[in-house]
A protein has these predicted regions:
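Substrate-binding/gating loop at the entrance of the active-site cleft, primarily
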Residues: 272
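Nucleotide/pyrophosphate-binding catalytic subdomain
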Residues: 1-268
Length: 272
């Protein structure tokens, strides 16, 4: 399989009927998107959405509408989500002081418990519920379910922060066969059953490879990946894994983006 195409999409510009376009503009959008609909009909598309999008009720609702629209035109979406802001908010309410190293949350046993509660019990439920307003379409999954995400420890100094050791996509594939929309939270477990919190970008990339996805869409509330950090007009809208590796090598991808750069490892992910 060739590398899935990676794209940054700003969720503030959805393609639903409530996006603020005039009727003639919506017609133009549909005409422009028809070739893409035809191209990707029947194909798996992994959609990674960050926790910031879920903090805005209107934005979350429009995201759900867009996922349902993809499904309705024959595309097979698989949603992978993060939940960093929600984890941070609950930790603050509980009086737990967060610690970050190299852009990653240091995760002790207490923090891991909070992350599991938020990702599996809150953010995942909210996304599933938002989609299912439009019909019984979405099914929520944790990476622990059916051995979907086999995790390994990234660095003992980070605690229970994990990497993807392997993906067993069988449960996701079964849901896709049933024309359902899998919604995956990024808690995985090692072979002993120990849970780990894994970066959602990393999971999205690994899952895309395991499923043979045609494309990955990254929805972000930031400007995206810039060829020149001082020039907002230099945003890179799409690239493959080889191009991303080049950007890492020449320093365009900076230390502050290290948690995302694992996306460049698409070809090296092991599947079961």
């Amino acid at each position: 399989m060739s590398d899935p195409l990676i794209m940054d999409v700003n969720p503030d510009t959805p393609i639903t009927s409530d996006s603020g376009f005039a009727p003639e503009q919506r017609a133009g959008v549909l005409v422009e998107t028809l070739p893409y609909i035809q191209r990707f009909a029947g194909q798996v598309v992994v959609v990674k959405v960050g926790g910031h999008a879920m903090d805005d009720g209107d934005l979350a609702a429009r995201f759900a509408e867009d996922v349902v629209l993809m499904h309705s035109v024959g595309i097979r979406p698989v949603v992978v989500h993060g939940g960093g802001p929600q984890i941070g908010a609950l930790m603050e309410r509980l009086g737990i002081q967060p610690e970050f190293r190299e852009g990653l949350r240091v995760t002790d046993a207490e923090t891991l418990e909070v992350a599991r509660m938020v990702l599996v019990g809150k953010v995942n439920r909210d996304i599933v519920s938002g989609i299912n307003v439009h019909g019984p379409l979405a099914v929520g999954l944790s990476g622990e379910d059916a051995g979907l995400i086999i995790a390994s420890a990234r660095n003992p100094e980070l605690g229970y922060v994990g990497d993807v050791a392997a993906i067993n996509p069988a449960i996701v594939e079964r849901l896709l066969v049933e024309s359902l929309i899998p919604v995956v939270s990024t808690i995985g477990a090692d072979p002993t059953g120990q849970p780990y919190n894994i970066n959602a970008d990393t999971v999205a990339a690994a899952l895309a490879v395991a499923l043979g996805a045609e494309r990955i869409l990254y929805l972000t509330d930031v400007e995206g990946l810039l060829a020149d950090t001082d020039d907002p007009d230099s945003r890179i809208s799409s690239l493959d894994s080889a191009a991303l590796e080049d950007l890492i090598a020449d320093g365009t991808v900076s230390a502050g983006m290290r948690s995302e750069e694992h996306t460049s490892e698409l070809q090296s992910r092991e599947t079961i």
